[in-house]
């Protein structure tokens, strides 16, 4: 797959040249492939939020560059607004940014600013609402009458209605109850499967990352600590733990079984994979 986004030797320093100078991102480099579901994980202060604000030009690099389809997004600063339509960013707790009188108007705000009108705008709004499970009868309600999870869906629909090529989600399930988290992630998985768009999911939850993404980028102290397929990353579980990061609950169980002498792959990260291995061991096989 060809990369749709490329981060090249990115550095961002806050307060440069002052006694309070601090680098939030240092010499980060990685590619994001077209149609990929990429997970980014790291502790608070690891550089996650600063990094993703560079992906659509909300922040300008101190050094390095961001390429969108091979072109530096800052090559023509006057066109940075176009980049923000192509790389949609949903902030943590986006429901706090809702402001219109109705759900419909809130979802319509972004595509209307793109120049959509009439039937084209109406289709964009209703299609985005449908993608995240908002019913037609909810479109004329005030967004402030909705539950927290429903507000989150409205905010997400407002970005989807602009039809971004890349969707960046910053802790999209933060503050939701377990049912709300799973319902929202199901909407996001359906969107990825049906539309084939590139998604970047930022989370502090290894379990959420493990269940959803194709590849993982692990950040620590403003640097990329490791990256790879989930099985490759979780195979380095001890390294993740020693770095103060977490592993999925299933991986933790597998690691403990391995320590107790069970012949099992400690990098498994799904219930199904662990079940297959345990059944294979019970039958005298090797399991995989």
Where are each of the predicted segments found?
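Conserved catalytic motifs of ABC-family nucleotide-binding domains
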Residues: 163
């Amino acid at each position: 797959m060809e990369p749709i986004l490329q981060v090249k030797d990115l550095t961002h320093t806050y307060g440069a040249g002052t006694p309070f100078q601090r680098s939030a991102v240092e010499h980060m480099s990685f590619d994001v492939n077209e149609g990929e579901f990429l997970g980014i994980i790291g502790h608070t202060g690891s550089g996650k939020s600063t990094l993703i604000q560079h992906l659509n030009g909300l922040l300008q690099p101190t050094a390095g560059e961001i390429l969108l389809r091979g072109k530096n997004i800052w090559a023509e600063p006057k066109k940075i607004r176009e980049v923000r339509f192509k790389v949609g960013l949903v902030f943590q707790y986006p429901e706090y940014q809702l402001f219109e009188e109705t759900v419909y108007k809130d979802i319509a705000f972004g595509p209307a600013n793109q120049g959509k009108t009439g039937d084209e705008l109406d289709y964009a709004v209703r299609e985005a609402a449908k993608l995240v499970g908002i019913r037609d009868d909810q479109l004329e309600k005030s967004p402030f009458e909705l539950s927290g999870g429903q507000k989150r869906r409205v905010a997400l629909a407002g970005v989807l209605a602009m039809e971004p090529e890349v969707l960046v989600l910053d802790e999209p399930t933060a503050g939701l109850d377990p049912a709300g988290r799973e319902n929202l992630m199901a909407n996001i998985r359906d969107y990825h499967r049906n539309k084939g768009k590139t998604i970047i999911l930022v989370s502090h939850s290894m379990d959420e990352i493990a269940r959803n993404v194709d590849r993982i980028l692990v950040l620590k102290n403003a640097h990329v600590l490791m990256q790879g397929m989930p099985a490759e990353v979780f195979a380095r579980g001890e390294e993740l733990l020693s770095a103060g990061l977490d592993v999925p609950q299933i991986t933790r169980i597998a690691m403990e079984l391995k320590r107790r002498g069970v012949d099992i792959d400690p990098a498994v990260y799904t219930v199904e994979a662990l079940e297959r291995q345990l059944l294979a061991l019970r039958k005298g096989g090797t399991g995989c």
